[in-house]
Design a protein with these regions (language model features):
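Hydrophobic, membrane-embedded alpha-helices of multi-pass small-molecule transporters
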Residues: 102-119, 145-153, 176-216, 224-226, ...
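Loop-to-transmembrane helix boundary motifs in multi-pass membrane proteins
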Residues: 12-30, 227-234, 287, 309-319, ...
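C-terminal membrane-solvent junction of multi-pass transporters and transport-like membrane proteins
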Residues: 47-54, 64-85, 101-102, 131-132, ...
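Helix-loop-helix module between adjacent transmembrane segments
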Residues: 1, 5-78, 86-105, 195-200, ...
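Hydrophobic alpha-helical segments and their helix-loop junctions in multi-pass secondary transporters
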Residues: 65-70, 74, 84-107, 115-117, ...
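Selective recognition of specific alpha-helical transmembrane segments in multi-pass small-molecule
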Residues: 25, 30-34, 84-85, 89, ...
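Flexible loop linkers connecting adjacent transmembrane helices
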Residues: 1-17, 210-220, 224, 250-265, ...
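Extracellular/periplasmic helix-exit of transmembrane alpha-helices
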Residues: 147-176, 230-293, 333, 378-391
């Protein structure tokens, strides 16, 4: 059961659309791999205990897969045994952090994504995703419990900040011209900042090509697909609202609660003399510190203020664990999808040169190319001088890659939604006003993300280091060309269907 969104595009827009879609997906997945390799490497550098747990977590997932699929152990028993081992691994990792450089982690993660993409899905991907579900529910459950215990606190974050902010938000390096200008307008550049699974082209590829094939019944698609998006929306809302609502201004939170907020942050590595608001922290630190502060503020009402710092440090680490677990999920899944897209792109070659086709589409060859290209983009740290202070600042690759990845991902979502709109027209035969329920948001999303990527290409890309101009800049340019080609095919097909 189930076909990929690329196959659906062929059915409603023609064979050319399928190959254009496949090429777009493949290039987009390169940016996904590069961005998440960089993010994961930075998380492991800043939280070495998360690195240790992740290193242990993978063999445990392999162990679970072997128990269930090779030795026939019941899932409930295998789950119980593996979860106990994971809990033991958590305590072990707290005492034995793994210290490696950012560059070393980038190489290790690239090799991991290569290995995971080539292995059978039951061997690592499926068991690890299954075990991650327990971590997700624990993460969300703690967040929900926290929101209940802190509902009486006054909101810290402002309802409105600014419609336009510095170009640094969308990847401009400190000291460059776009970083000094308020050119990052909320519309249309918000999809270059927020790359959430609640609106994600990457997820459309996973859902249509992988998840759909695992459904027992087509009727389950509504519960699994729509239910997953509702859950993802809830998670994204908690991730954004809870830390900002509770911990926007550190001094204000300390004054309102009487808790040692500033001391806790200092012990967690935050320079509170310079960083007074959570928005001033980097993306990863914003997430981990915000989650830690929110949970510590809530649980200190149960365990007392004396435990505040320990609770904060513990749940800051827990947030890093959760983040790294889902980043690794993205890495191996993205590379596996890139491998499939690569193979499908060359299926026309099978009848013309079978030997060449076999070499190009070999599972290990197809699994190696994307992480190698991603590693080239993710590997370097860029050292820049902040003009205002003269301080030397090391900028991780994801700061520059994230807007490019985010934009291509959201544009893929728009293209998938437009393909879905044509499917509604062709297959379901839906006409009239109700058809605009899918067509209107798809067109608005396409216009928004296309405009945002053009802005990034014009205003940000020329000021990036040469590597990112040649790498991310070229990928975005190619993606926009493919985007225009697909929208032309969409218009042509839509006219035929009307």
């Amino acid at each position: 059961g189930g076909v990929s969104i690329m196959t659906v595009s062929e059915n409603v827009m023609g064979r050319r659309a399928r190959y254009i879609f496949l090429a777009y997906v493949w290039f987009a997945l390169i940016l996904v791999l590069a961005a998440f390799t960089s993010v994961a490497s930075s998380v492991f550098v800043s939280t070495p205990t998360a690195a240790t747990l992740s290193l242990i977590y993978m063999p445990l997932a392999l162990f679970f897969g072997l128990l269930v699929y090779r030795f026939g152990v019941r899932i409930s028993y295998a789950t119980l045994v593996t979860l106990v081992l994971i809990i033991l691994a958590i305590f072990y990792s707290l005492n034995y952090p793994t210290y490696l450089t950012y560059e070393a982690w980038a190489v290790i993660l690239a090799f991991y994504s290569f290995l995971a993409a080539g292995l059978p899905v039951w061997y690592l991907l499926q068991p690890r995703d299954y075990l991650n579900a327990y971590l997700l529910w624990a993460f969300v459950g703690v967040a929900l419990f926290t929101s209940v215990l802190t509902f009486d606190l006054a909101l810290q974050g402002p309802i409105y900040t600014k419609f336009a902010v510095s170009g640094a938000v969308i990847g401009a390096l400190p000291g460059t011209t776009p970083a000094k200008m308020d050119i990052a307008y909320f519309w249309p550049v918000v999809p270059l900042v927020i790359a959430c699974g609640a609106l994600s082209g990457f997820h459309s590829v996973v859902a249509s090509g992988t998840t759909s094939k695992q459904l027992a019944n087509e009727l389950d698609a509504l519960f699994v697909g729509f239910g997953a998006m509702l859950t993802e929306g809830a998670v994204s809302s908690l991730a954004v609202i809870l830390p900002i609502a509770v911990a926007w201004n550190f001094a204000s939170l300390q004054a309102a609660t009487g808790l040692p907020v500033l001391e806790a942050l200092s012990k967690g590595g935050v320079d509170v003399s310079k960083m007074t608001e959570i928005i001033q922290l980097g993306a990863v630190d914003r997430f981990t510190n915000g989650y830690g502060l929110a949970v510590a503020t809530a649980l200190s009402r149960i365990f007392g203020p004396s435990q505040y710092i320990d609770i904060f440090l513990g749940f800051k680490t827990f947030a890093a664990w959760a983040l790294s677990a889902f980043i690794l999920t993205t890495l191996d899944t993205a590379n596996r999808l890139a491998r499939f897209a690569w193979r499908e792109m060359f299926d026309w070659l099978e009848d013309r040169s079978r030997t060449t086709y076999k070499i190009l589409t070999n599972r290990w060859v197809a699994s190696a190319i994307p992480p190698i290209l991603a590693l080239i983009l993710a590997y370097p740290k860029i050292d820049v001088i902040v003009p205002e202070t003269g301080a030397k600042l090391s900028v991780y690759a994801y700061s520059m890659l994230w807007p490019a990845f985010s934009g291509t991902n959201q544009l893929l979502a728009a293209l998938a939604l437009l393909t879905g709109a044509l499917w509604v027209y062709f297959v379901l035969g839906v006409r009239g006003r109700i058809s605009w329920l899918i067509l209107a948001p798809a067109l608005f999303l396409w216009l928004t993300v296309t405009a945002a990527l053009v802005m990034w290409l014009v205003f940000i890309m020329p000021y990036l280091p040469v590597l990112y101009q040649a790498g991310a800049g070229t990928i975005i340019a190619i993606s926009l060309i493919l985007d225009i080609m697909l929208i032309m095919l969409f218009v042509k097909a839509f006219r035929k269907s009307v």
